Amino acid sequence: MNLSRRLPKTLAVTVPLAAILATAACGSGIEENTASATPVATAAVAAQAPADQAAKGTVASNRLTVATAGKAAQAALAKCQADGLGFVTVSVVDRAGNVQAMLRGDNAAQHTVEASRQKGYTAAAFGANTSDLAGRAKGDGATVADLEGTLFLPGGVAVKAGNASIAGIGVGGAPDGMADQACAAAGLDAIAGSLQ
């Protein structure tokens, strides 16, 4: 989907810049990953970067370890199975929406795979549970629901280290989104002691 056709020109530029700024604000240590900085930020934004990052030309970002992501996925699926909802899919994604762990329950339909990933990404990107974000996706004209890869339905939980959103746990497939949400929350509870 080409957002520049659907959003006013200033918003089409502001949304990617806001995403860059939000990503730069991530901080505190789960697993450190560095990547080359994209030359999109303005000089004013670059001037605000810590001196050590500016000298390196890279920024650090945190993500869950594979063991922690797997533990969250297993706990979320176990909760759904205990509730008689073993036909869901659980996805644990990093802040960029990259899948770190995924478990597909027995008889989970194909659409649950993408729904769980999108819910996890939406929670991670916005730093909030998707059940709390659903109201932002309503209205006339362009809304955040038009952002590609997002899904503003209950079932996504943000994973935070300190105040920084570093991942999301998404569950898709239960007949009620709040049941998906409860399973995702169980995944977060299982790893809460591992987050710094």
Language model segments and positions:
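Flexible, solvent-exposed loop/hinge segments and secondary-structure transition points
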Residues: 27-196
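Bacterial N-terminal signal peptides that target proteins for export
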Residues: 3-13
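C-terminal motif of bacterial Sec signal peptides marking the signal peptidase cleavage site
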Residues: 21-25
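Hydrophobic helical h-region of N-terminal Sec-dependent signal peptides
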Residues: 13-20
